[in-house]
Amino acid sequence: MSDFDSNPFADPDLNNPFKDPSVTQVTRNVPPGLDEYNPFSDSRTPPPGGVKMPNVPNTQPAIMKPTEEHPAYTQITKEHALAQAELLKRQEELERKAAELDRREREMQNLSQHGRKNNWPPLPSNFPVGPCFYQDFSVDIPVEFQKTVKLMYYLWMFHAVTLFLNIFGCLAWFCVDSSRAVDFGLSILWFLLFTPCSFVCWYRPLYGAFRSDSSFRFFVFFFVYICQFAVHVLQAAGFHNWGNCGWISSLTGLNKNIPVGIMMIIIAALFTASAVISLVMFKKVHGLYRTTGASFEKAQQEFATGVMSNKTVQTAAANAASTAATSAAQNAFKGNQM
């Protein structure tokens, strides 16, 4: 009966509770696939829970992460520290050089007042023979050449010690082979001859050359030192009846007696080391000689000046001139009488 009382032109869904807007809005918000989801169907069907949740904005405060680069003030501090260390190093070097110059000046003043006293070889005061030379690297030799001159001095000492050991090597060889008396005698002679002669003939000229920048002394050193190098090579070879425990003599002694042969081989190695070091130092001294400005012309001038300024040469020349003048006058007088 109510159907007949209703308005035929009214909306039929007006009184439908399922058509209410609030209900239809909720049903539209249901995730898709919820009605079609079947847990027993193919696993490739996405589950209803696979809906992406909306991104929640981060409410934490922004924090800046530190970078790997150091701040500018840190680099400036490091550069300042390096510059300060370099300045301190230079200052210490300058102070050391100033102290060295001050010490050398005081020593020169003492030498000018009291004179230079010989101090080499260092002998005791009660020894009957006194020192023959004056030697002080810090006073006589410039700083840039002191190391080279000291090495040459140590090389001379090394060769002297080798010659001294050579005496014992030849003595041991003579004990196992009585025909080696000549080698033992010559070994003593070489020690007594080469030790002082090498010091006077090539080391002292080298010392004086660097002390006074003398071209003439450099040439004397080069000439004598070449001969010294040849002697080192011959001693390392060790020919029979030459008084040297070289390689040839060592092999011969090794056939006679093994301990004696080993002793001689050690001495031969020392002679070989002397020859090699001599060659190396010769090249080094020659390189320094080329930087000093020395030349053969300067050596000739120094030789002529030294000869003419030598009192002994002057006296001999004056005596020769007076003798020649006297003989010429006598011959002229005799010629006039005739």
Curated annotation (Swiss-Prot):
Taxonomy, superkingdom: Eukaryota
Paired cysteines (S-S): none
Cytoplasmic side, ranges: 2-155, 203-217, 283-338
Disordered, as annotated region: 1-64
Predominant location category: Golgi
Gene Ontology terms, MF aspect: protein domain specific binding
Keyword Magnesium among record annotations: no
Keywords: Acetylation, Endosome, Golgi apparatus, Membrane, Phosphoprotein, Protein transport, Transmembrane, Transmembrane helix, Transport
Residues annotated with Phosphoserine modification: 2
Side of membrane Lumenal, spans: 177-181, 239-261
Lipid bilayer topology: Multi-pass membrane protein
Modified residues (Phosphothreonine): 45
InterPro entries with a match to the protein in the record: SCAMP (IPR007273)
GO terms for cellular component: clathrin-coated vesicle; cytoplasmic vesicle membrane; membrane; recycling endosome membrane; synapse; synaptic vesicle membrane; terminal bouton; trans-Golgi network
Transmembrane segments: 156-176, 182-202, 218-238, 262-282
Location relative to the cell: Golgi apparatus, trans-Golgi network membrane; Recycling endosome membrane
In-chain residues carrying the UniProt-annotated modification N-acetylserine: 2
Single GO biological process annotation from the record: protein transport
Claim: DNA damage is one of the keywords in the record: no
Family from the record: Belongs to the SCAMP family.
Cross-referenced PANTHER family: SECRETORY CARRIER-ASSOCIATED MEMBRANE PROTEIN 1, SECRETORY CARRIER-ASSOCIATED MEMBRANE PROTEIN SCAMP
Function: Functions in post-Golgi recycling pathways. Acts as a recycling carrier to the cell surface.
Record note on quaternary structure: Interacts with SLC9A7. Interacts with SYNRG and ITSN1.
Protein name in UniProt: Secretory carrier-associated membrane protein 1
Lineage, highest ranks first: Eukaryota, Metazoa, Chordata, Craniata, Vertebrata
